[in-house]
Amino acid sequence: MTQRSTKTAFSPWEMVALESFQTPEHTQASQWRRSWRAATTWIMGREASEHQAKEESELRKLSEVALSHWVPAIDWTPAARALSQVTEGYVDAPVVLFISPPHGGHAAVVSHWAQQQGVNCISAPTLNELTEGCLEWVERCGSQRQWVIPALERHFLRHTQGLQGVRELLERALSGRLGQGVIGCDSWTYAYLQHAVGLEGVPVVTLQALEGEQLAHYFAQLAGDGGVRPTVYSSRTGQPILADVSEDSADGERSYKELQRLAAHCRGHLGIAWHYWRERLREPVGNDESGRSQEQSEGQPKEPSKESSKELWLLDALAEAELASDTGDVATLLLHTLLIHGGLEDQALGYVLPFSSHEALNARLALARQGILRCHQGRWQVAPLSYASVRQLLESRNYLVDPL
């Protein structure tokens, strides 16, 4: 595989043209492992299929206070600056698309870019406006020299009327009748619109996929900002998986291999890897119990001590909510529909699915109970820790999948 420039600076913010995007090393092997693990779990049961150096019963979840300390939210501002540099090379292009996978931050990045540039964001149409083919939101683009749409997936429905607006937008923009635009777009929405509407000639950029070494540096800096970094161990191997970012040692190389496994599982996407890191991070049972009791008795949550909370553990990345291999057609089509729309509210399902609202709701409820779906800001979407298995299932059944 071609060596990439990100190796020198370890930056997670390399912005590249879509055709230059490369998944991390061992991505295909990660898919094989996921399939094998699902098969052995089905045959032998979950306990027999897993051998862990540290059992989950010996660990516990971190408090929200501790999580906000060790794993703060991703700051997408550097990505917005990288987008600004890239767009300078497309001064003659009427539209530039920035795409990311689900949970990949495209809306936040483009919103930050708009704020940096002093450009107004175009608000999304309502569900009623989409189903009626309303074009008022397109007209709002035409009245500005520059315009921004942070999340294009909120501006269409896979519905006869629901595609009219985005078709009109692209026709006007590419013909030069609108000002210059920057659009954030879910990678699944992009794949669908490329197929249904056509996006030939539109420059498309994305963040380059990360390798394990880059994830190690990013998470080490995230956890150790302004203080002592924790030692994070793998529950699978018992070995440390975060090395001191100032060291170039054999121990560091071994730790990168473990995070390479996570990078491959997440296809190199920082947003999804961050969710794994936050959701799967644990501390030993009995760690700092007295300190916790004192905090609770005082009724005042405190920031965890970096000195007393140095030992943390990461549960196996592959042990997420997994789709059964015999997932039915209704559930599979629902998952694909949610992905190409970047998530949908319940009342929108009847407009975009070829079966009754009752069937759609039953499938949605079942997937939510399994942990495959989650509700975020009123919309049902594929949960971050289930995304890899959902994508693999859809690809295996020859559904249209995203390019990332």
Residue ranges and their predicted role:
Residues 1-140:
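Extended, compositionally biased accessory segments flanking or bridging domains
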Residues 279-359:
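Winged-helix-like regulatory helical subdomains adjacent to P-loop NTPase cores
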Residues 387-404:
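Short, amphipathic alpha-helical interaction segments positioned at domain boundaries
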Residues 354-370, 375:
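Short amphipathic alpha-helical interaction segments
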Residues 251-278:
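The conserved phosphate-sensing helix
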Residues 153-197, 204-208, 212-215:
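Sensor-1/coupling segment of RecA-like P-loop NTPase cores
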Residues 204-255, 264-265:
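Conserved small helical "lid"/interfacial subdomain of P-loop NTPases
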